[in-house]
């Protein structure tokens, strides 16, 4: 049996037990980005590609670079171990926020206040095709 796990600012716990400041710009203004990585047989799938897109997205948004592979690898391994995902599939979500800002408004805060957190929980991936309906003007 697996357990959902989370990490933020050096602390492990559950997503419900850990705290994210309510003035974090990711919560207030959607000022951040994320990557969701499939964990299969205790291994992250396409991790290099996900991390490259994560890094490229941060640059496109003018954000500091998110944590890179060397810093993430022990955290990802720790999350897999703590969640007891061995044969179950999991969804690892890597979150990168511009961080908290003492002032209100959409003006960008000074660099260096970014925040990273991750969550991992068991999932059943869907690989079937999805149809979307669009309306043309």
Explain the meaning of each model-derived region:
Residues 1-137:
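Conserved alpha/beta cores of soluble small-molecule-handling proteins
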């Amino acid at each position: 049996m697996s357990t959902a796990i989370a990490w933020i600012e050096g602390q492990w716990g559950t997503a419900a037990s850990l705290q994210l400041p309510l003035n974090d710009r990711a919560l207030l203004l959607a000022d951040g980005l994320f990557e969701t990585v499939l964990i299969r047989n205790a291994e992250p799938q396409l991790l290099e590609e996900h991390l490259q897109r994560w890094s490229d997205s941060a640059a496109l948004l003018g954000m500091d670079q998110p944590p890179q592979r060397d810093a993430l690898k022990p955290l990802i391994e720790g999350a897999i171990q703590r969640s007891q995902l061995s044969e179950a599939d999991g969804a690892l979500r890597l979150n990168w926020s511009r961080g908290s800002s003492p002032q209100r408004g959409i003006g960008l805060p000074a660099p260096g206040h970014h925040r990273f957190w991750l969550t991992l929980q068991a999932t059943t991936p869907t690989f079937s095709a999805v149809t979307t309906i669009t309306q043309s003007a």
